[in-house]
Amino acid sequence: IKMLGGNISSYYQLLKGYNDKSNKKITNKPRIPGYLHKTEGRYVVEFTNQTFAKKRGENNELILCPKDLNIPIPTKIENPKCVKIIPKNGCFFIDVVYEVEQKPLRKTHKYAGIDLGVDNLAAITFSDGTNPLLVKGLKVKYINQGYNRLIAKSQSKLPNNQKTSKHIHRLFRNREMKLQSEFHKITGFLAEYFDEMSLEKVFVGKNDNWKSGISLSKKVNQRFVQIPYNKFISQLKYKCSLRGIEVVEQEESYTSK
């Protein structure tokens, strides 16, 4: 119920921003959260640490609701805050949420700016004159394009009254997992690199049209918008925060200066 209430609150906040003509960030009218499918719809289920068994299982797994459900969750995390079971793309993902101690933010006055793209996933410049760094994005691009073609081909074979299938769900899931794996490798490398350079802040150029595709040609839009840059930024943020480096999102025009 709390999650549903939060979804409705978020909708009205977005709607307020959309109706505010001075707010140029929200360009598409938000849609009110709809009903789930009456037979296939699934909600996210969250288990707080109050539902965990006091003792671990035989293989040191976490036990959810030992008296009623007795669900074993393999995890090395000692003191999880909660566990979420998330239905997505025809399967269930398990998120184990825990708290970690962050390093205090640095005050080195050394900065970096990142512009995100397609062929070059990240173009990075440094305030101290260090040579720019380019992170090639060809593998991410080919994963994205390859799965998009497979999904489009599978969708074209569906009956008129059918919107998706188990095979399409599996393609979406595989695409997302491969992209996420690549992002983890790249953001892990960047966080280590920035740490070695003793950076204080990293500014990431954020384009509010990534999702809506406004002002992008159809060909570029197919390649650019569907790459989940927000997930890349999110991963970079938390990995840098563990090292005392702040990641700030700004409009692309500022990071390029």
Question: What is each PLM-predicted segment?
Answer:
Residues 90-257:
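Positively charged, helix-rich recognition surfaces that bind polyanionic ligands
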Residues 1-88, 226:
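Acidic carboxylate diad motif detector
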